[in-house]
Regions:
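Glycine-rich phosphate-binding loops of nucleotide-dependent enzymes
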Residues: 2-232
């Protein structure tokens, strides 16, 4: 049984249909990449899984349980957390207060405040600062740490590298490797094809709200990926 399964998933913003019959599975312990151009439906898929966008109850299952009709906080309690695009930290709160918010769902596990600070030492040094005082890379670390504080079985990461310098992106993805080593299952949305394939075991390429290509990440023909990415 897959940890996450989407069957015929459709998603709408009002009358606009953003996803068309998405079939996607994530096995326990995998790292899945979702790639595609802007507007392909990648973020919409993550929002549907995380409960931020309503969809049919039977269209998404987590560990065999339908979750499409659940609220976002119910889904977090089941073990799904999301690192949203743009970080979405609370600017009036300190770094540590932002992190502690992630633990309010009450799930037990390896990820504690001390463990997050071990993963991101610079957050420990800046724990008393307001989130707005952090650099973009540090804010991304705080957003990841906040999600980890809920001790998720499945971590959804939306555009981790967006707007960050290459050296910062490298450090962020090195930390993602440490999270994977802890046994966390990941779904990573990323526009950088090379980075997405290097970080994942399998990938799905979205194009205009549909799955255009799905395959193992290692050794797949890059020309075929590029064609699916741009709809050529």
């Amino acid at each position: 049984m897959s940890l996450l399964r989407a069957r015929g998933l459709r998603a709408f913003y009002g009358d606009f249909q953003a996803l068309f019959d998405i079939d996607l599975r994530v096995e326990d312990g995998e790292t899945i990449a979702i790639i595609g151009a802007n507007g392909a439906g990648k973020t919409t898929f993550l929002r549907s899984v995380a409960g931020a966008l309503a969809c049919g109850n039977a269209m998404i299952e987590f560990d065999g349980r339908p979750i499409g009709a659940l609220t976002a906080h119910e889904i977090v309690r089941l073990g799904i957390a999301m690192v949203p695009e743009g970080r979405k930290l609370f600017p009036s709160l300190t770094v540590e207060e932002n992190l502690l918010l992630g633990g309010y769902c009450g799930r037990s596990g390896a990820w504690t405040l001390a463990r997050v600070y071990e993963l991101f030492p610079m957050l420990a040094e800046r724990r008393a600062l307001q989130a707005t005082a952090l650099s973009g890379g540090q804010q991304q670390m705080a957003a990841i740490g906040r999600a980890l504080m809920s001790n998720p079985r499945l971590l959804l990461c939306d555009e981790l590298s967006l707007g960050l310098a290459p050296v910062v992106i490298r450090d962020i993805y090195a930390c993602i490797g440490a999270i994977i080593a802890e046994g966390t299952t990941l779904v990573i949305v990323e526009q950088d094809i090379t980075r997405a394939l290097d970080a994942s075991t399998r990938f799905y390429c979205f194009q205009e709200g549909r799955v255009a290509l799905a395959a193992a990440s290692r050794g797949f023909d890059r020309d075929a990926i590029t064609s699916a990415y741009f709809g050529l």
